[in-house]
Swiss-Prot record:
Originating organism: Streptococcus pyogenes serotype M12 (strain MGAS9429)
GO CC terms of this entry: cytosol
Molecular-function GO terms, alphabetical: ATP binding; phosphoribosylamine-glycine ligase activity; phosphoribosylformylglycinamidine cyclo-ligase activity
EC number: 6.3.3.1
Subcellular location(s) per record: Cytoplasm
Entry-linked InterPro entries: PurM-like_C_dom (IPR010918), PurM-like_C_sf (IPR036676), PurM-like_N (IPR016188), PurM-like_N_sf (IPR036921), PurM_cligase (IPR004733)
Top-level taxon of origin: Bacteria
Pfam families: AIRS, AIRS_C
Protein name: Phosphoribosylformylglycinamidine cyclo-ligase
Amino acid sequence: MSEKNAYAKSGVDVEAGYEVVERIKKHVARTERAGVMGALGGFGGMFDLSKTGVREPVLVSGTDGVGTKLMLAIKYDKHDTIGQDCVAMCVNDIIAAGAEPLEPLYFLEPLYFLDYVATGKNNPVKFEEVVSGVAEGCVQAGAALIGGETAEMPGMYGEDDYDLAGFAVGVAEKSQLIDGSKVKEGDILLGLASSGIHSNGYSLVRRVFADYTGKELLPELEGKQLKDVLLEPTRIYVRAALPLIKEELVNGIGHITGGGFIENVPRMFADDLAAEIDEDKVPVLPIFKALEKYGDIKHEEMFEIFNMGVGLMLAVSPENVNRVKELLDEPVYEIGRIIKKADDSVVIK
């Protein structure tokens, strides 16, 4: 028995792997940008940092996946947008990265992205769809897709199962690092709308809608099928935020992901400050009203789990608010302000 046949009998289809590479080349080509070196398929992706024009470059990296939202993509057999979710989770984090309030919060331009797919059985058509979504996310973020890995792992995953993760690298001008100390009492909190649930809280989402087919037209969802709302891809905020940073209009940035308002907003500022949120001004999306109703979730807990309709929050000096609104070609929501901390870091009124 030949080695090739032996490997195939163990569940690994080498030819399918080659086919995936051929299928995704046209999608990868869409993401080309200055600085990319080498061709797809090498042992490592290469990028020429000198092409960025940054004088004192600081590299910032982030890695993430899409959590159990992936299980819904598998359940509904829809794979062409989950890749965008993966890119969004990485690049939105490296827009404003820093786990503690006074660590540097970086704003940067994404440079490149790499993806990793692991599966029980390599399906070239399916994984072309996945990578097409990754490429779309990279185009929206201005990042080049310079490499990746598709690992066929029979026995580790079921034949229809797969996992998806990504890794993003961006560059910032050292002099333009955003420090949390710039956020001050009296700053206005501006919210940019989310596209939906994004990619967090899906273990709860799946429990709430476990007995639904996905084709339901719930009255709260304004005529959209449930599955389409649940799989709405995560919004990428890079292009919206870049002009604001270039004009130095933003003191702090918060990516509202897992942990909702309560966990993510305090990462924008120092320990002696707090965010006062006017709940009536938060543009709560219909899906969150449906989740609260059908999941019997306490209202205050919703803000501890979900973005509630705001995916990116900006802390802006009052005198800069109008200019920020001019630059953003979209609705901007004044949802609160920065106050001196008394007890809680986030106060929702």
